[in-house]
Regions:
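A short, conserved beta-strand element in the Rossmann-like catalytic core
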Residues: 5-7, 31-34, 96, 115
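Catalytic donor-sugar/metal-binding loop of nucleotide-sugar-dependent glycosyltransferases
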Residues: 63, 98-117
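Catalytic core of nucleotide-sugar-dependent glycosyltransferases
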Residues: 46-53, 129-149, 214-220, 256
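Catalytic cores of eukaryotic secretory-pathway lumenal/extracellular enzymes that build
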Residues: 70, 110-111, 117-129, 143
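Long helical/loop segments within the catalytic core of UDP-sugar-dependent glycosyltransferases
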Residues: 9-91, 132, 139, 143
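The conserved acidic donor/metal-binding loop of glycosyltransferases
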Residues: 1-6, 86-89, 101
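Membrane-embedded multi-pass helical conduit in multi-pass membrane proteins
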Residues: 167-256
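Acidic donor-binding loop at a coil-to-helix junction in glycosyltransferase catalytic cores
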Residues: 91-97
Length: 256
């Protein structure tokens, strides 16, 4: 974990219990110390709480591998020896470590009773720089590990490989490229304006639906994890409304 992280008093005890149950790699519940500061910190904090509660917890229930985050995880000496230390140096080395472990057949566990408190960015500029690194890191990991994951998914019928191939795939970039190509096809006379306007109208509806879904997801996260979130109901209502802005800002970030 990072030097500025705070740990629940039972963190090490709970992680050790999970480790003793047989997992060689474990991640924990990633909470935040400053969720209530503003809409930027709340967006990041809710994202990580959602990942812990609904993604990693669900993967554990399904018997699939979980995703190691940038802090709050552990691995055995055996894994360290196999990797000859820490050999991961892409921009998102936590994600690289996750993909490498899956390709080695490891199942990464999640310990929801071990809670870590991380500090989130409080200005949009800080958040932009952080997520720009993440976006570029995802593309790096997809470049180096994407085909290997696809091959493992097909040959081994490994659900974790399918899961994380979809996680790495840059769908936002592909979606915007599709719109640009549509406009170019119209300009060169390959397709009609009417067909593209119809498609754009469909995309506009999808964006509205996505915004509503994002707010619902933020609200669901807050309701499910209310006991672990230190903010007033008034603040949380505002952060539900601002959550889609935080998420949609990934679109321009992805193209830098």
């Amino acid at each position: 974990f990072d030097a500025d992280n705070r740990l629940d008093r039972h963190y090490v005890e709970e992680m050790n219990k999970a480790f003793q149950s047989g997992f060689r790699i474990l991640t924990s519940y990633r909470n935040s110390v400053n969720l209530a500061d503003n809409w930027v910190s709340s967006g990041s904090a809710l994202w990580f709480i959602r990942e812990s509660r609904f993604l990693n917890n669900s993967r554990m229930i399904l018997g699939s591998s979980c995703h190691v985050g940038g802090t709050g995880f552990m691995f055995s000496r055996e894994v360290m020896r196999r990797n000859r230390g820490w050999k991961f140096h892409l921009l998102t080395e936590d994600l690289e470590f996750t993909m490498d472990s899956i390709l080695h057949g490891d199942r990464i566990g999640y310990c929801g009773t071990a809670m870590l408190y991380d500090e989130q960015p409080v200005t949009f500029q800080q958040s932009w720089r952080q997520r720009l690194r993440w976006s570029k890191g995802f593309l790096q990991v997809f470049r180096y590990y994407g085909m290997a994951l696809i091959k493992r998914a097909v040959r081994e019928r490994d659900f974790s490989s399918v899961d994380f191939t979809l996680l790495l795939c840059p769908f936002t970039v592909l979606g915007v490229i599709r719109i640009v190509l549509g406009l170019l096809f119209v300009a060169f006379g390959f397709v009609t304006w009417q067909s593209q306007l119809s498609a754009i109208a469909g995309w506009a509806f999808d964006i509205v639906l996505a915004v509503v879904t994002m707010m619902a997801l933020a609200a669901l996260t807050i309701v499910a994890e209310r006991d672990h979130i230190g903010a007033t109901n008034k603040e949380l209502f505002a952060y539900v409304l601002s959550f889609p802005i935080y998420i949609l800002s990934y679109m321009p970030i992805s193209f830098q």
